[in-house]
């Protein structure tokens, strides 16, 4: 009977709907939530003081200047932060709302969530009852790509509209599974930069990603529609935390990668693409002029002004420029030649077969005409009926010589940056005639000649014979006026210092004289031009001899002499000058060879000369990341030991007669196509430490080398590339080690490149994924140093 009495009640309980999940306010007003380890903070923020626009976002928690990595309501800001909330609704969604604006943002999860997690990686995750994610911020990024964030073909990182406006901008980073590459895209449709195809080891256009201590990359299911890509940053050792790093699509359309420097408490730009801002599609807008030589990339030509002054001041140039005196079509309009320029995209045109004067007359009579260009030989006239975008100087064979319609009311309007600069600088030139004479007298004491830009332009035949290009600028071969002596003229790009600072540093460099340093003969510091004139080195740079397919072959005797001479030159910079000079860019391209193949170190002092900070120095090392010491990335202070590391990497290349990083295995010899040899240092380190030095030596030498010198030089190289800068020898000691004055023992294996040899791939295609709650594989150390010591001496200091 009791069972009969309670049975209907039990049935009733089963028939009732489950209790609803109660709504939960997660954040209200100025409240914040910290992630595990307090690395990230979730809360409301405003980009400027006094702004009425507030956003829910994720930022780094402990930094003096807020750095936002994700924004929820980037399209609809809230205006009343005090009543604004982040809430988990009873229906299982995350929403941002307030009393005044209502719901301004909501997650789009397909299944209801019951709770949330805020991970130490900066990922906001909505989970269900069994803890599985139903939505996460990593799948819905804004402009930032964090370590551990899995990028698919459905994921896009879109820039902010401007520095202070988080709303979606014009530029996005996307993974294209069909092309197996990342692309930077303008307005979702126009690609303007790509990484190139995935080779199984790296993207073709980004060889630096193969350096093991910077990232660990994983490409899952490449060449398929479900392809995904993610990365992590391994710690430098077993006790330190991984470096804070992030990729960001800037509002200016460049993809940048930053690392955090705990010493200076600031972000350092480690990498960016495209390097030339003028390659960014439509950066300067209609009738805006783009030049990488300006302090800011975009300018309006005289006679034009920004359409949006406020946006222009905040580095948003997308609205472009307009005529100062209204639209074209007035009787007072006239024409001025722009010169050979190119522009982005297509422009609506009308084609005619008329003379130049008739072409101009036709344009002037058409209210829609912006300008024209005319080909004299064929009388081809093209009338521009739309304003061209992102004007820039023409390069190569693509040239569109445009004549723009300008109004002359109030001023002489000349559209053409090449014409504008002399007009701006006329007043300055009179003042500098007097100072140049004083400069010539002062620098003559240092045997430095002060050149005019016109003199160097003439000496290089209009900068026509380009013999090299480095991070600091292009190098041209020339002949000094009234002489048959060849010189190398380096035209510096993006000068970072004022004229007085530039001349002071030139004075310092000119005072440095050493047989293994390239001699500075003179310079030019005129207007925006910064040029350095060096002795010309007829045998070129060491880099031209480091290819197995090159017909040039250096004997072992020459290689050893180059190594010793380079070491002496660097040691003089570190220890022989009044002020220690850290080169910051030791690599084969900066080791030049005179007619007798003696080594001459070039580009010394340029990092300081151009005001290069961490970001700008590393920006010069595009394609040469194999020489960058770990402390560049870890945030430790940069000392002379950074040059020692780079020198050690260069020694390995000199011994092997090849580059350290080779993405395309076709450039290797037939016997050297093993997968591990795509990155030479870890394999070479293992062979050298285990006593198999002969296997590392350039096979083209056919055994014609001094075994004792090879062993000594190879062992010194491994000492130089130690992870811990404290156990790397000073350059003065390196010289003595190479000379045989200081004996050398077998060094410990470098831990960072050791991880690569152990089989923990940084280059291959991974079949695993890195998900929340499951740590990505750690660095392994599978290479141990032999117990026996070398027969030639004590450990080096």
Swiss-Prot record:
Q: Where are the transmembrane segments?
A: 402-422
PROSITE patterns documented for this protein: BULB_LECTIN (PS50927), PAN (PS50948), PROTEIN_KINASE_ATP (PS00107), PROTEIN_KINASE_DOM (PS50011), PROTEIN_KINASE_ST (PS00108)
Q: What is the uppermost EC class here?
A: transferase
* CDD domains, A to Z: B_lectin (cd00028), STKc_IRAK (cd14066)
Q: Which Pfam families match?
A: B_lectin (PF01453), Pkinase (PF00069), S_locus_glycop (PF00954)
**According to the UniProt entry, where is the signal peptide?**
1-23
User: What sequence ranges are listed for the domain Protein kinase?
Assistant: 461-742
Q: How does it sit in the membrane?
A: Single-pass type I membrane protein
List, as start-end ranges, the regions of compositional bias called Low complexity: 784-797
Keywords, A to Z, come to: ATP-binding, Cell membrane, Disulfide bond, EGF-like domain, Glycoprotein, Kinase, Lectin, Membrane, Nucleotide-binding, Phosphoprotein, Receptor, Serine/threonine-protein kinase, Signal, Transferase, Transmembrane, Transmembrane helix
The alphabetized list of GO BP terms reads: recognition of pollen
The entry's protein name is G-type lectin S-receptor-like serine/threonine-protein kinase SD2-2
């Amino acid at each position: 009977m009791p069972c009969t009495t309670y049975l209907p009640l039990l049935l009733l309980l089963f028939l009732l709907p489950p209790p609803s999940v109660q709504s939960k306010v997660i954040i209200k007003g100025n409240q914040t939530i910290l992630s595990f380890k307090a690395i990230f903070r979730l809360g409301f923020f405003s980009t400027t003081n006094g702004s009425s626009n507030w956003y829910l976002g994720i930022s780094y928690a402990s930094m003096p200047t807020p750095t936002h990595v994700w924004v929820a309501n980037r399209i609809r800001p809230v205006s009343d932060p005090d009543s604004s909330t982040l809430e988990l609704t009873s229906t299982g969604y995350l929403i941002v709302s307030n009393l005044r604006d209502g719901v301004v943002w909501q997650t789009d999860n397909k299944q209801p969530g019951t709770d949330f997690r805020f991970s130490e990686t900066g990922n906001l995750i909505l989970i269900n009852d069994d803890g599985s994610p139903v939505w996460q911020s990593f799948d819905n990024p804004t402009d930032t790509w964090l370590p551990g964030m899995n990028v698919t073909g459905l994921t896009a990182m879109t820039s902010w509209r401007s520095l202070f406006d988080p709303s979606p901008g014009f530029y996005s980073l996307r993974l294209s599974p069909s092309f197996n590459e990342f692309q930077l895209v303008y307005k979702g449709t126009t690609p303007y930069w790509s990484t190139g195809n995935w080779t199984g080891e790296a993207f073709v256009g980004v060889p630096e990603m193969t350096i093991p201590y910077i990232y660990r990359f994983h490409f899952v299911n490449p060449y398929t529609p479900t392809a995904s890509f993610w990365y992590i940053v391994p710690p430098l050792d077993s006790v330190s935390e991984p470096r804070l790093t992030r990729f960001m699509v800037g509002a200016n359309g460049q993809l940048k990668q930053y690392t955090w420097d705990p010493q200076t408490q600031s972000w350092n730009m480690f990498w960016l693409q495209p390097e030339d801002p003028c390659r960014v599609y439509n950066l300067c807008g209609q009738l805006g002029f783009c030049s990488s030589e300006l302090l800011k990339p975009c300018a309006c030509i005289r006679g034009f002004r920004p359409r949006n002054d406020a946006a222009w001041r905040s580095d948003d140039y997308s609205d472009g420029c307009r005529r100062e005196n209204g639209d074209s079509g007035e009787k007072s309009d006239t024409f001025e030649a722009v010169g050979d320029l190119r522009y982005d995209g297509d422009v609506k045109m009308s084609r005619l077969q008329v003379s130049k004067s008739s072409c101009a007359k036709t344009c002037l009579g058409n209210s829609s005409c912006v300008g024209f260009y005319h080909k004299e030989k064929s009388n081809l006239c093209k009338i521009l009926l739309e304003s061209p975008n992102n004007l820039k100087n023409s390069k190569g064979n693509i040239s569109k010589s445009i004549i723009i319609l300008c109004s002359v009311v109030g001023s002489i309007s000349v559209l053409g940056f090449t014409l504008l600069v002399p007009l701006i600088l006329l007043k300055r030139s009179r003042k500098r005639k007097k100072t140049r004479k004083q400069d010539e007298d002062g620098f003559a004491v240092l045997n430095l000649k002060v050149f005019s830009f016109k003199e160097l332009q003439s000496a290089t035949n209009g900068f026509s014979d380009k013999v090299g290009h480095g991070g600091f600028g292009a190098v041209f071969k020339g002949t000094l006026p009234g002489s048959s002596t060849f010189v190398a003229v380096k035209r510096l790009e993006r000068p970072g210092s004022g004229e007085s600072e530039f001349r002071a540093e030139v004075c310092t460099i000119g005072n440095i004289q050493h047989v293994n340093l390239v001699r500075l003969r003179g310079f030019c510091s005129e207007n925006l031009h910064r040029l350095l004139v060096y002795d010309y080195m007829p045998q070129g740079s060491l880099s031209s001899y480091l290819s197995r397919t090159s017909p040039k072959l250096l004997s072992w005797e020459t290689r050893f002499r180059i190594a010793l001479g380079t070491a002496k030159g660097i040691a003089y910079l570190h220890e022989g000058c009044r002020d220690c000079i850290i080169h910051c860019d030791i690599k084969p391209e900066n080791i030049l060879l005179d007619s007798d193949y003696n080594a001459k170190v070039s580009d010394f002092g340029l990092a300081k000369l151009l005001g290069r900070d961490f970001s700008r120095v590393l920006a010069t090392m595009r394609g040469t990341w194999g020489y960058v010491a770990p402390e560049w990335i870890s945030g430790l202070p940069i000392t002379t030991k950074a040059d020692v590391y780079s020198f050690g990497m260069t020694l390995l290349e000199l011994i092997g007669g090849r580059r350290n990083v080779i993405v395309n295995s076709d450039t290797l010899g037939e016997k050297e196509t093993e997968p591990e040899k795509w990155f030479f240092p870890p394999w070479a380190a293992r062979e050298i430490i285990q006593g198999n030095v002969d296997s590392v030596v350039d096979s083209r030498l056919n055994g014609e080398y001094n075994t004792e010198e090879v062993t000594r030089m190879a062992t010194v190289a491994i000492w130089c590339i130690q992870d811990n800068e404290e156990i790397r020898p000073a350059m003065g000691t390196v010289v003595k080690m190479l000379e045989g004055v200081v004996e050398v023992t077998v060094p410990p294996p470098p831990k960072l490149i050791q991880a690569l040899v152990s089989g923990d791939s940084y280059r291959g295609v991974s079949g695993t994924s890195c998900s929340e709650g499951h740590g990505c594989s750690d660095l392994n150390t599978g290479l141990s140093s032999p117990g026996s010591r070398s027969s030639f001496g004590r450990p080096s200091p």
